[in-house]
């Protein structure tokens, strides 16, 4: 029966979550304070590291005794080079296996690097936050929440009670995929491979969901998307099984679909089995207990009973080794149990190793260590695959940070030829890797060599280790939990280069490089997973761990580190990345920095490996990007790498001979040659031994190597060829012989070097042509070509390897047979022989004839088209054919031929074809896209890249002519006639489709510039292309008018956030923009930032809005300051011009505005506004400024009234004084206005508007300056001022209470009566407010606190004390003045008022107490 899965998608939440949150920006500060081991190791290719004599010439090389890979003398150049490639491959494949440097013993060898060092083995490249929607679900969880990672598909998951949510953590705004059909709390989730033959092929994984009652299996379809991520779909399988009494916390799966379970209640291992359909004696899904089969599985364990003698034991993890069919379990008692998966449903426990056994093994190997005692626990296991090590099986991590490497053996392994595939029977500790030293004692000598100190067995650097993960070939991640809320992540990797260059006579050591990955504060690591394919440089232990061999062939390893805040992506740095970054640091360093770095690499990794890395970097490798993502290396770094390759590559020399070898055979080629061979070998190592084709069912032919991989390899080889060609004049062995006389030995050595380098060049040429041939082969119908071959040729094609195709005569001969078959097939299908031959010449280059033949054919087709002007179908076919032919030879078309063709296309109204041809020619003339790099670099003068741009410009100018002609030919023509597009509309649409669909960025920039020159800005706004944005963004940096155009572009597409960003950046820029215009820009930016934009999170909007608001506030202050200074009569006119030039432009810092202008000019109101904008926190300074502002305002008001009185009296004003038009306000009124202005602009900020201290100041001003009833003012005007500003009644009363109680001047003696009057006035207004609204209503309506809406007993007590104060004043007055009747009456009236208010307050308090007792 056909395997089938029910195709019903799981219902769930598909929510568009907002973008991840970022840290809130800190408020800016106010003002800046005014400043008053032995010999060098040999390399595998024969060139040993040696000291560098100078930066101009490499030093002498030490003969290692290893023969440099050389070829036989009687072979042709390509075959010689191929032999060198094979020898180099063999050397790379002989890299030591893990067992050889993890032999019995212990080590603490690390070379620690800081996280920001160019030598750091890992670095964080991206961080993806957990979506806000997930946090909302997590916060809503009631019973149990859990996070996890499916790194192999790029997804994370969260279980909240009985719901499960998955999301693509690489997506900035991921969609949540939910499973909410579980009825019980989810305890564990795992993604495992499906069992073959059970589901349809679209099911790529099985999602196992364990709850407290059952275990559910869901089908998962993970399909790749164009962006490189995975699209996930869940399907119900209707497969579930009852969980039983055992807990399920750990779920693992094997590659053949078996699913094992374990939990934290016991150490039992369960297995879930499932099948396509039910059978007689088995259901579709079931569960087996492999630890206690049968009835024992349901009998309670004695350990759980009160009389149980043993401590309760449970699992801490399950781990699968598919390469050995082993399952490991780890318990809380650090016991490791090994199970062997013998058959499809059988699981047998073969080894149980407890902690005591490990301690005993350690005692046999090394002295005691405080890191490995009976209190030490094992926290994690990591299986070591059989492809990586034949002896070592497992790595265990202790909570003290020690790595224990354990081997497992069977009895058969002790016999000669014993079967090693049998289940192991014993396990033994082989090697211990201790943590790095807490204080590194490793030192580096002057020549860069490292001297190791003794074994350190006491370091607590990794204590306590909470989690640990090991990935092949030894990438180690250790989560160190020294602080309760902060994890530290230690990562290390084998130092492959040092292991590789260890001398044969020396014992191999487990050299490692380590570093600490810095995580944000508060991060707790939950899980770490490998997101790229597992590492494997070989299929067997020997050569498996050679990272250097595959650094140009495989993507660097990437790892997802899941924390409670998100997923951190950590990437492995290859040696070429480290070298490139180290050279990048030398760009701006001293002259001898390059020598120091190269010396360091040579001493550590050998000269050949170093020079190979330099060559790779010079060819564009080492950009620290993933393989295939394009070049990212800067030119300065490439130049330094080129210098290192040329200057430190060494020289060929004659070795000492015993006389049995010929002179030429005793030549030791230079490290430069060996490095070139090494780099070339590593570029082609994937395909070198691979077969070209694979034959499937029905003679279906496919490529064994993906064509994209072939293209990448070809591009890298071509870069290498171009590099050698461009620098051949300076590379010894490629350059012409020097004029100085050589000795015979030097001459022979240089000839041999030249021959070897020439052979490698010929091989590179053959590789490039061979790949082109294969690509062309698969562009054709290769199955038809295969069918046309005879049986012998068919078999030869099936057996053909790339090595044979590139370098061997039989492969070349077979290629000629295939070429003939291709031509015959095309002839049979009616194709022209010349067309086929041209394709072969273009793709392979070996059968090249002048491109003029194709050009003539294209022109012939164009001429025939002009004769068919009235036969539209034939005309279109001939025009299309001519365009196709022209595009084939676009790179060789002369400007004259191109111009003629375009003119003919225009005459035939083939506008789209004319534009397409010009675009193709422009691209072919500059295939390296150097014109774009020249434009991106700002079009520097006297640059060789300008020539490429000029050649492109010729094509673009022709496109302008075509578009001009198109518009003039169809000017005034209607777009539609009878509802159908006219010929004019069709031609215009075709032409502009070609224009807008072009991927030529340089063309788009040129086109938009032409549009602007012609005033067609509306066309730019109507184009939906990323190139428009890039173009306008560049112009916006230098032109305010174009920046406005960019804002219009954004707003017309509802991209308000980007528009706000542009406007904010413009306001902050140094462009010639007035301050008023900057205020307008910031006002618009604030408005645009307030509008919701799709894809922009609320927090991003708030951040931008906050920034624009702050800048707008500063700009308003600067504008006020500018207007005040320009109108200030104290400032000379020439100084005003300077001020206007400085302030009427870029927004200045608050420091400049305060120190240079506002403070010096005594603009105290502006000083207070600056304090507010800067979040200034000095209460003394702020209060002093208020005092100065009040005194200044009082003086100005009195002075204006004095001038008014002079004018009214007909007198003359002093010179320079402007006569007032209307009567100026009284001083207290003017002071009130100033206070109101500051209050409104600072929104009663408690720092700038401190009521507790400001209200007494204003009250004291009123008393000291007679601003009371004596001038007709309301005696209580200060209190009314603050209450009208919205200051709470309670706060005003409390401040007045403090004034009354402290009795500080001027509130002493009889003036305390005025304070009582203010208190009575404030309480009276408060009582009225409470009575008007009602206490609870007032609290609900105004949002005030309880003390504001509901009076406390303290108010009644205050009124009582106020009455006592009045009594005292009355008594004092009677004694001093004999009891004047008017004063006594005034006090008596005030006392009656106070007593009445006290009764009102008591009544309110009584009502409130009654309500409280009622509800109580």
Swiss-Prot record:
Nucleotidyltransferase as a keyword of this entry, yes or no, is no
Which GO molecular function terms does the record list?
A: structural constituent of nuclear pore
Gene3D superfamilies for the chain: 1.20.58.1780, Nucleoporin, helical C-terminal domain, Nucleoporin, helical domain, central subdomain, Nucleoporin, helical domain, N-terminal subdomain
Q: Which InterPro entries match?
A: Nucleoporin_Nup133/Nup155_C, Nucleoporin_Nup133/Nup155_N, Nucleoporin_Nup155, Nucleoporin_Nup155_C_1, Nucleoporin_Nup155_C_2, Nucleoporin_Nup155_C_3
Q: Which residues form a coiled coil?
A: none
Which controlled-vocabulary keywords does the entry list?
A: Membrane, mRNA transport, Nuclear pore complex, Nucleus, Protein transport, Translocation, Transport
Q: Taxonomically, which superkingdom?
A: Eukaryota
Q: What's the short name of a Pfam family annotated to this entry?
A: Nucleoporin_C
Q: How does it sit in the membrane?
A: Peripheral membrane protein
* Localization of this protein: Nucleus, Nuclear pore complex; Nucleus membrane
Q: What's one GO BP annotation on this UniProt entry? A: transcription-dependent tethering of RNA polymerase II gene DNA at nuclear periphery
Q: Where is this region: Disordered?
A: 1-26, 50-69
Q: Can you name a GO cellular component term?
A: nuclear pore inner ring
What protein family is recorded?
Belongs to the non-repetitive/WGA-negative nucleoporin family.
Q: How does it assemble?
A: Component of the nuclear pore complex (NPC). NPC constitutes the exclusive means of nucleocytoplasmic transport. NPCs allow the passive diffusion of ions and small molecules and the active, nuclear transport receptor-mediated bidirectional transport of macromolecules such as proteins, RNAs, ribonucleoparticles (RNPs), and ribosomal subunits across the nuclear envelope. Due to its 8-fold rotational symmetry, all subunits are present with 8 copies or multiples thereof. Part of a tetrameric NUP192-NUP170-NIC96-NUP53 or NUP188-NUP170-NIC96-NUP53 module.
User: What's its job?
Assistant: Functions as a component of the nuclear pore complex (NPC). NPC components, collectively referred to as nucleoporins (NUPs), can play the role of both NPC structural components and of docking or interaction partners for transiently associated nuclear transport factors. NUP170 probably plays an important role in NPC assembly and organization.
**Protein name stated in the entry:** Nucleoporin NUP170
Upper lineage ranks? Eukaryota, Fungi, Dikarya, Ascomycota, Pezizomycotina
Q: Which gene encodes it?
A: NUP170
């Amino acid at each position: 029966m056909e395997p089938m899965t029910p195709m019903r998608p799981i219902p769930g939440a598909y929510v568009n979550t907002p973008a991840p949150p970022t840290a809130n920006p800190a408020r800016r500060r106010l003002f800046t304070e005014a400043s008053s081991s032995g010999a060098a190791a040999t390399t595998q290719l024969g060139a040993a590291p040696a000291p560098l004599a100078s930066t101009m010439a490499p030093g002498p090389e030490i003969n290692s005794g290893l023969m440099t890979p050389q070829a036989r003398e009687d072979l042709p150049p390509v075959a010689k080079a191929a032999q060198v490639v094979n020898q180099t491959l063999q050397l790379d494949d002989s890299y030591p296996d893990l067992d050889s440097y993890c032999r019995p013993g212990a080590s603490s060898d690390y070379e620690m690097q800081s996280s920001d060092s160019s030598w750091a083995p890992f670095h964080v490249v991206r961080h993806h936050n957990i979506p806000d929607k997930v946090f909302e679900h997590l916060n809503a969880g009631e019973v149990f929440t859990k996070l996890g990672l499916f790194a192999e598909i790029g997804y994370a998951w969260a279980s909240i009670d009985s719901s499960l949510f998955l999301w693509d953590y690489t997506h900035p705004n991921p969609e949540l995929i939910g499973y909410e059909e579980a009825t019980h709390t989810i305890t564990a989730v795992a993604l495992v491979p499906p069992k073959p033959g059970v589901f349809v092929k679209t099911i790529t994984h099985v999602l196992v969901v364990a709850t407290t009652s059952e275990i559910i299996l869901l089908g998962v379809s993970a399909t790749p998307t164009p962006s490189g991520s995975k699209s996930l779909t869940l399907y119900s399988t209707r497969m579930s099984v009852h969980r039983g009494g055992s807990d399920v916390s750990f779920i693992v799966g094997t590659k053949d679909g078996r699913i094992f379970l374990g939990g934290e209640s016991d150490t039992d291992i369960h297995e879930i089995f499932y099948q396509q359909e039910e059978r007689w004696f088995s259901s579709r899904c079931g569960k087996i207990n492999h630890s206690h089969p049968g009835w024992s599985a349901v009998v309670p364990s004695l350990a759980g009973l009160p009389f149980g003698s043993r401590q309760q034991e449970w699992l801490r993890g399950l781990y699968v080794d598919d390469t050995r069919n082993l399952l490991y379990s780890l318990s809380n008692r650090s016991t490791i149990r090994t199970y062997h998966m013998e058959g499809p449903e059988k699981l047998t426990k073969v080894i149980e190793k407890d902690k005591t056994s490990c301690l005993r093994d350690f005692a046999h190997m090394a002295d005691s260590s405080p890191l490995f005692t009976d209190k030490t626990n094992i926290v994690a296991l990591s299986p070591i695959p059989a492809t990586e090590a034949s002896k070592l099986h497992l790595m265990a991590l202790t909570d003290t940070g020690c790595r224990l490497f354990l081997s497992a053996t069977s009895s058969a392994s002790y016999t000669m030829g014993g079967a090693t595939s049998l289940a192991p029977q014993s396990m033994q500790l082989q090697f211990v890797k201790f943590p790095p030293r807490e204080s590194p004692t490793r030192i580096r000598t002057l020549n860069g060599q490292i001297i190791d100190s003794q074994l350190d067995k006491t370091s607590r650097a990794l204590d306590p280790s909470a989690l640990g993960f090991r990935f092949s070939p030894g990438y180690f991640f250790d989560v160190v939990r020294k602080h309760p809320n902060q994890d530290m992540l230690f990562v290390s990797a084998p130092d492959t280069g040092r292991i590789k260059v260890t001398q044969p006579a020396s014992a191999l050591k487990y050299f490692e490089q380590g570093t600490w990955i810095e995580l944000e504060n508060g991060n707790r690591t939950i899980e770490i997973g490998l997101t790229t394919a597992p590492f494997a440089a070989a299929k067997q232990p020997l050569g498996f761990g050679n990272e250097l061999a595959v650094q140009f062939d495989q993507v660097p390893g990437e790892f997802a580190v899941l924390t409670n805040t998100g997923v951190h992506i950590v990437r492995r740095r290859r040696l070429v990345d480290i070298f490139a970054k180290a050279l990048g640091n030398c760009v701006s360093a001293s002259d001898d920095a390059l020598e120091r770095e190269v010396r360091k690499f040579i001493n550590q990794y050998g000269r050949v490996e170093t020079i190979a890395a330099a060559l790779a970097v010079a060819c564009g490798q080492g950009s620290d990007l993933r393989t295939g993502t394009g070049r990212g290396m800067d030119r300065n770094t490439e130049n330094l790498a080129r210098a290192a390759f040329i200057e430190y590559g060494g020289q060929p020399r004659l070795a000492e001979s015993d006389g049995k070898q010929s002179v030429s055979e005793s030549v030791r080629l230079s490290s430069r040659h060996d490095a070139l061979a090494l780099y070339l070998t590593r570029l082609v190592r994937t395909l070198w031994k691979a077969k070209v084709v694979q034959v499937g069912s029905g003679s279906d032919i496919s490529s064994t190597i993906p064509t994209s991989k072939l293209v990448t390899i070809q591009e890298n080889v071509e870069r290498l060829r171009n590099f050698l060609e461009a620098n051949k004049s300076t590379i010894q062995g490629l350059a012409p012989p020097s004029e100085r006389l050589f000795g015979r030995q030097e001459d022979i050595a240089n000839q041999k070097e030249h021959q070897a380098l020439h052979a490698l060049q010929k091989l590179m040429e053959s590789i490039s042509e061979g790949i082109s041939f294969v690509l062309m082969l698969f562009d054709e119908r290769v199955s038809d070509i295969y069918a046309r071959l005879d049986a012998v040729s068919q078999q030869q094609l099936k057996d053909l390897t790339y090595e044979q195709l590139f370098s061997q005569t039989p492969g070349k001969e077979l290629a000629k047979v295939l070429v003939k078959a291709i031509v015959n097939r095309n002839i049979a299908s009616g194709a022209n022989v010349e067309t086929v031959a041209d394709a072969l010449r273009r793709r392979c280059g070996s059968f090249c004839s002048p491109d003029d033949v194709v050009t003539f054919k294209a022109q012939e087709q164009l001429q025939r088209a002009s004769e068919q002007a009235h036969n539209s179908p034939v005309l279109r076919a001939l025009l299309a054919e001519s365009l196709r032919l022209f595009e084939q030879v676009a790179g060789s078309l002369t400007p004259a031929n191109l111009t003629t063709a375009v003119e003919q296309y225009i005459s035939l109204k083939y506008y789209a074809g004319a534009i397409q041809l010009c675009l193709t020619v422009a691209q072919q003339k500059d295939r390296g896209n150097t014109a774009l790099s020249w434009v991106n670099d700002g079009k520097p003068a006297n640059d060789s890249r300008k020539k490429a741009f000029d050649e492109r410009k010729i094509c673009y100018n022709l496109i302008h002519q075509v578009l001009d002609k198109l518009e003039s030919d169809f000017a005034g023509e209607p777009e539609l006639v009878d509802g159908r597009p006219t010929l004019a509309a069709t031609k215009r649409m075709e032409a502009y489709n070609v224009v807008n669909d072009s991927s030529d960025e340089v063309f788009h920039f040129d086109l938009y510039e032409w549009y602007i020159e012609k005033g067609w800005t509306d066309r730019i706004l109507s184009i939906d292309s990323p190139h428009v944005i890039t173009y306008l963004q560049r112009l916006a940096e230098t032109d305010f008018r174009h920046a406005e155009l960019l804002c219009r572009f954004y707003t017309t597409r509802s991209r308000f956030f980007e528009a706000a960003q542009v406007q904010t950046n413009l306001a902050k820029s140094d462009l010639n923009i007035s301050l008023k215009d900057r205020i307008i820009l910031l006002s618009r930016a604030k408005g645009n930032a307030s509008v919701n934009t799709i894809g922009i999170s609320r927090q991003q909007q708030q951040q931008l809005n906050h920034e624009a608001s702050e800048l707008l506030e500063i700009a308003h202050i600067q504008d006020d300051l500018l207007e005040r200074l320009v109108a200030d009569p104290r400032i000379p006119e020439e100084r005003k011009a300077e001020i206007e030039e400085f302030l009427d432009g870029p927004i200045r810092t608050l420091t400049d505005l305060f120190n240079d202008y506002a403070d010096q000019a005594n603009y105290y109101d502006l000083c207070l506004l600056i304090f507010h904008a800067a979040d200034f926190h000095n209460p003394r300074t702020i209060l002093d400024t208020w005092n100065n502002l009040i005194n200044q305002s009082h003086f100005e008001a009195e002075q204006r009234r004095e001038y008014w009185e002079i004018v009214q009296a007909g007198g003359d004003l002093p010179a320079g004084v402007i006569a007032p038009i209307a009567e100026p306000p009284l001083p207290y009124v003017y002071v009130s206005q100033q206070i109101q202005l500051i209050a409104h602009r600072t929104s009663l900020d408690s720092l700038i508007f401190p009521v507790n201290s400001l209200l007494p100041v204003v009250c004291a001003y009123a008393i000291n300056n007679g601003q009371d009833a004596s001038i007709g003012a309301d005696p209580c005007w200060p209190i009314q001022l603050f209450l009208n500003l919205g200051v709470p009644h309670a706060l005003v009363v409390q401040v007045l209470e403090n004034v009354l109680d402290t009795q500080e001047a001027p509130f002493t003696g009889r003036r305390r009566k005025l304070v009582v009057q203010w208190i009575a006035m404030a309480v009276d207004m408060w009582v009225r407010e409470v009575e008007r609204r009602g206490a609870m209503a007032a609290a609900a309506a105004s949002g005030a606190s309880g003390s504001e809406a509901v009076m406390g007993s303290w108010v009644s007590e205050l009124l009582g004390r106020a009455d006592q104060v009045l009594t005292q004043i009355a008594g004092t007055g009677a004694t001093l003045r004999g009891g004047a009747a008017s004063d006594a009456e005034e006090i008596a009236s005030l006392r009656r008022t106070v007593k009445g208010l006290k009764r009102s307050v008591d009544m309110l308090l009584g009502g409130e107490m009654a309500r409280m007792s009622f509800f109580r």
